[in-house]
Design a protein with these regions (language model features):
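Enzyme catalytic cores with a strong preference for nitrogen-chemistry domains
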Residues: 1-174
């Protein structure tokens, strides 16, 4: 609400901001997954009258597979869900243990009672600002040889949002 009051049109929150990044195997627990959906539903209700596009990170179970996702929402509506493509599995990162990589194939899924597109190749266009075309990727996606953002830009994206988070380990900054 504060962002909308200040005229912010796009608010990008961190990867897994609805649960925290360091949940590890707790991501596999139905209670945590439902808690993330409950938080998303609450956000949808709180943003019904707001003219800000918000991107929030959450784990999402789709057809029996768990994904690390960005939910794109505005005015109480889910505009789409973008799953992470490249899952890190080195050092302190073990995402392949819990998550499935996203696909460019777009499918329709039901989230919080809304039918929404789900896929890594989604672009979000603003009717009031035709030159504003949003592409979304998550953290490690950016560091791949061919990041989703490259394909988003080639498809017409003028803004790329990257939801990122990381855990903290002793000596990481060294």
């Amino acid at each position: 609400q504060t962002a909308a009051q200040r005229g912010v049109k796009l608010a990008v929150f961190p990867e897994f901001c609805l649960t925290g990044y360091t949940c590890g195997d707790l991501f596999l627990q139905r209670t945590l997954q439902q808690g993330a959906l409950d938080a998303l539903e609450w956000l949808l209700a709180q943003t019904r009258t707001l003219d800000t596009v918000a991107l929030v990170g959450l784990p999402l179970l789709v057809h029996g597979k768990l994904y690390n996702c960005a939910a794109v929402l505005c005015r109480g509506q889910l505009l789409g869900i973008v799953p992470k493509t490249y899952l890190p599995n080195y050092g302190e990162f073990y995402e392949k243990r819990q998550f499935t990589p996203g696909s460019t194939e777009v499918q329709t899924v039901t989230v919080c009672g809304q039918q929404v597109p789900f896929g890594t190749s989604l672009l979000f266009r603003c009717r009031q600002m035709p030159s504003f075309v949003l592409g979304v990727e998550l953290c490690e996606d950016l560091w791949s040889a061919l990041p989703p953002s490259t394909f988003h830009a080639l498809a017409g994206a003028t803004v790329i949002a990257n939801l990122s988070a990381s855990d903290e380990t002793v000596g990481k900054a060294e």
